[in-house]
């Protein structure tokens, strides 16, 4: 209901007594959606723990936490790039944006958004190596080669419209090396992978928020690299031990991609109130 009402709230400004009132209404409805999701999941799991009959997969706490993790992960993944274009083109004075770079229009910022999604692809390709039944030595070689092959695809695609500079390629290559080190340290352990890349993601967002220039820009872009492996890790940890309820639990997890529709507008409203850079702090808390 709150999602429906939030869409219905988007009416022409002249039909409302105050545009400010409309913005507050949208923010409240979005917060209600967010709180409702968390409350319903916790309530269902709490009730199931007392009397599991009829609750199916929801009686397992790892699934409940996994549902919330998928919700927030997808929300963060979508949010970083959804508002990145606005961050790069918003002029705070003298043709400079909030991270201290020259203001970029949509065409100029498109390659950075593409690079963010490319980072997601790089991480997914690299993470998939663990699914193959190959020797450990070959796996280690592929862990190093695969991300750069994927990056080559990203570079080639951008070359047709807005090519990356040698400097940008070099910086992102160094970030890929950090990701590779993370994979080596985790040693195919889903819990370790999630812990390492969650920490790296938080560090990247902090650098983006409090840094400036290309350092801040590429810190935000690195969010794609570090978010990329979260889905399979959360999924596998959440359905462990569900037995006959594995299929049902998987369905619940997929439903929680709803976070990608709730968290981005919430950050957008926070950006309107506190500023775009400050609004990215919400991603760290999530």
Residue spans for each PLM region:
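Extracytoplasmic gate region of multi-pass secondary transporters
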Residues: 6-11, 61-113
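Loop-to-transmembrane helix entry
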Residues: 95-116, 144, 165-168, 247-251
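C-terminal transmembrane helical hairpin of 12-TM major facilitator-type secondary transporters
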Residues: 142-230
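A membrane-interface helix-boundary motif in multi-pass transporters
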Residues: 9-29, 269-284
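Intracellular juxtamembrane helix-capping segments at the cytosolic ends
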Residues: 229-243
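A late C-terminal transmembrane helix in Major Facilitator Superfamily
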Residues: 244-271
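Helix-to-loop junctions at the C-terminal end of transmembrane segments
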Residues: 123-137, 181-189
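Conserved small/polar residues in nucleotide/adenosyl-binding loops
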Residues: 1-5, 284-286
């Amino acid at each position: 209901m709150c999602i429906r009402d939030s869409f219905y709230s988007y009416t022409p400004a002249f039909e409302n007594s105050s545009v400010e009132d409309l913005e507050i209404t949208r923010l409240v409805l979005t917060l209600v959606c967010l709180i409702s999701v968390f409350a319903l999941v916790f309530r269902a799991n709490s009730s199931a723990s007392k009397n599991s009959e009829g609750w199916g997969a929801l009686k397992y706490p790892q699934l409940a936490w996994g549902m919330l993790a998928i919700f927030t992960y997808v929300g963060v993944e979508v949010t970083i790039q959804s508002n990145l274009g606005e961050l790069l083109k918003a002029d705070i004075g003298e043709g400079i944006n909030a991270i201290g770079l020259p203001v970029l229009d949509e065409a100029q910022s498109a390659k950075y958004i593409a690079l963010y999604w490319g980072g997601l692809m790089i991480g997914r390709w690299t993470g998939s190596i663990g699914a193959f039944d190959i020797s450990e030595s070959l796996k280690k070689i592929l862990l190093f080669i695969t991300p750069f092959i994927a990056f080559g695809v990203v570079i080639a695609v951008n070359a047709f419209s807005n090519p990356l500079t040698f400097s940008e390629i070099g910086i992102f290559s160094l970030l890929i090396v950090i990701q590779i080190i993370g994979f080596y340290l985790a040693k195919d352990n889903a819990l370790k992978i999630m812990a390492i890349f969650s920490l790296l993601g938080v560090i990247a967002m902090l650098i983006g928020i409090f840094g400036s220039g290309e350092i801040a820009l590429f810190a935000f872009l690195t969010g794609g690299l570090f978010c990329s492996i979260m889905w399979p890790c959360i999924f596998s940890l959440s359905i462990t031990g569900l037995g006959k309820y594995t299929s049902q639990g998987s369905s619940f997890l997929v439903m929680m991609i709803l976070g990608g529709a709730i968290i981005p507008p919430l950050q957008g409203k926070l950006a309107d109130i506190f500023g775009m850079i400050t609004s990215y702090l919400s991603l760290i808390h999530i």
